[in-house]
Amino acid sequence: MAAFSQYPLSTGWSFKDSDDQSPEAWMPVPVVPSVAHQDLQANQKLKNPYIGFNELDARWVNDKSWTYRTVFQKPAVAAGSSIILAFDGLDTFATVKLDGSVILQSDNMFLAHRVDVTKALEAEGDHVLEIDFDCAMRRARELREKDTKHNWASFNGDPARMAVRKAQYHWGWDWGPLLSTAGIWREVRLEVYSAKISDLWTEVELASDHQTARVSAFTEVDAADSVDSYKASFLLSLHGKEVAREVATLKDKVAKVTFDVTQPSLWWPNGYGDPALYEISVSLEKEDCEIHSVSKKIGIRTAELIQQPDRHGKSFFFRINGVDVFCGGSCWIPADNLLPSITAERYRKWIELMVAGRQVMIRVWGGGCYEDDSFYQACDELGVLVWQDFMFGCGNYPTWPELLESIEKEANYNVRRLRHHPSIVVYVGNNEDYQVQESAGLVYDYEDKNPENWLKTDFPARYIYEKLLPSVVEKLSPKTVYHPGSPWGDGKITSDPTVGDMHQWNVWHGTQEKYQIFDTLGGRFNSEFGMEAFPHMSTIEYFVENEADKYPQSHVLDFHNKADGHERRIATYLVENLRTATDLETYVYLTQVVQAETMMFGYRGWRRQWGDERHCGGALLWQLNDCWPTISWAIVDYFLRPKPAFYAVARVLKPIAVGVRREHHDWSVTHAQPPKTSKYELWIASSLQKETVGTIELRFLSVNTGLDVRAPILRDNVKIVPNGTTNILEGVINHKAQPEPHVLAARLWVDGEVTARDVDWPQPFKYLDLSDRGLEVNKVSESGNEQKLLITAKKPVKCLVFEERDGIRVSDSAMDIVPGDGQTVTVTGLKAGDAPLKYKYLGQ
């Protein structure tokens, strides 16, 4: 009995323009997985589309069909074994031919395919595998033209994209280029076996006291013949040590065992405990010979989405292992427009950055793709909760029968693939499709509960989100929460702040409110909000080739910002808040200050609301990352270089954070006058699970002199409420008695150490003289590749930002420094002889 074997088909490929019939048309493919844009670049047929205006020069690629071909020899096959040709992903309209015969046709990028080629490979010698990838943009237009009755309402990209099960951002989005890829985007291989494990999954029940857990493990076997003589040997282990072992027989090609685990190690999100991962493995055996084995990492945990009526409306927050978790985090878009170029190492670096930024949840956005296994593995290992959208975004999707069938297969395949990951705590039906329904005035009668009726309306996609997808999740991953859409709340208008989740875009988009009042604009769970900022100069220098173009309003910089009204909106927030500048380096910095302040005001206020009976259950900023070097809402750019907002968010999400703010005074309205008085508030937010005692100080420091304008306030033995908010004090600033502009500087000590700071500034910054700050940055120690810098100032300093240099990490940046409160920053990665990091602050 031969064991399972596999043979990757990753090399030896060539490709060509499908319309070019000349023998010289074939070009070598360095490695598969790949897409045509990558392979054209490798053959010097296409310039890097991420530089300058090269995206425009790459548009011709979108309109072409491409053919890939390889020649291989039949592997050794034992008697009774089958040969399977396995494709993990084909992008998108693919016709697969083996030795000239069509063996597969696919029109869904998100599906894997398995084709039995045993008979086709009976002949010895060379075999030719050829894949024709038809032009997805053309096919999309043809499909749209066939369905004239459907209302193709959408935001972003060509509405025809909704006819195709392909990453929707490939049609261009308001943060990315229009690069429609084609190719073998995931692994292809030959598998040879008489029997193999086709699936391994678990169902976990954790006792309410967390003292015991029951792990039921299941395996499914793929075999041409009877499996009565096979057995499945299961092993559960933790950190390489055996926890339990059991052997089971197969019935209808499925085996099941149940393990009772005492004192289980639980999987926790980062900041709440160790994300303990058990390993479940199964070996398929016959006559004491191992035929095939599979193992997966799983977590023992519970995850609930708490939606209960309360005085604010209806709650929306996550409870993990019985602990309420404020989900501060980010939305995730694909990390590249050319998906096969993203390595497992790059995925892990992104998730490591999230954890370094104290973020606990990532939302996989519905216009991209179901991510690579390595993405979810990193989230499992590092304790990051995953909000997983299904791949529908910003549109009214059609529902003809063939498309629904393909969507159901897609959902089944991906939920099966992902269901063992403890990081995934919610599946969500779509991104903003209910907002499209509202915008276009499509029919949505929430009280009509008959799915067949929904298909007859002009919003038939409701059937996908409220019938098809939840049925798949219930069948395959019954303990994972399903939510129909983002945003969505009980069928109410999606901007309703009392229920469900909310995308709050009235800062930047919409009514373009002042970012200083962001916290008043939120809902029960703020799953999108953002502010644009330029990336660092090193990133700009990558995609802006000509020195003459390195100014804020250059055509190439404009071209690399795809957002609607981008320049005008950036300018609005700049001129309202800061003294403007025209040199590029300062302009870049100023946009980053605005983004950092916006994120701080939002997160700080919403985290405070967590303590008000879970008024706000979480905040997921738009967006963590970029898919190309660009100007966008990302807080970390394409090259993993954090913008100042990354650090601002990290400080607000500390286990214990202090907040201080004065009431907002709108200086931009007609006949605005300086306020005579301003109320202020001081509070502490804690995610710790036990009460803590600390000392808190509030100082009132002149912006102009750095001196106290009134006596500090000091409170000892302050009891800090666990997993909530502790309101410390309220007061009033009398601007007649204290006319000098001054900051409110708060410090919190716990166990004798400063654990948190916050500084509230008079707004807007443009009215302040921030020159001559007396700032000093001194190296106080050095050990190996680690340096410690002490930062002091004679007058309050706003947003001290360190240079982001590849391979170098700073423990903090975008900092406010006040007199009498020196702060230490650790720099990791600088070698002896390296130039010190440059820095910039407001008013410098």
Swiss-Prot record:
Keyword terms: Carbohydrate metabolism, Glycoprotein, Glycosidase, Hydrolase, Polysaccharide degradation
Active site residues of this protein: E432 (proton donor)
UniProt cross-references to Gene3D superfamilies, sorted A to Z: Galactose-binding domain-like, Glycosidases, Immunoglobulins
Gene Ontology BP annotations: glycoprotein catabolic process; polysaccharide catabolic process
Catalysed transformations (reactions): Hydrolysis of terminal, non-reducing beta-D-mannose residues in beta-D-mannosides
Stated family: Belongs to the glycosyl hydrolase 2 family. Beta-mannosidase B subfamily.
Record's miscellaneous remark: In contrast to clade A beta-mannosidases, which are likely secreted, clade B proteins appear to be intracellular.
Protein name: Beta-mannosidase B
Protein source organism: Aspergillus flavus (strain ATCC 200026 / FGSC A1120 / IAM 13836 / NRRL 3357 / JCM 12722 / SRRC 167)
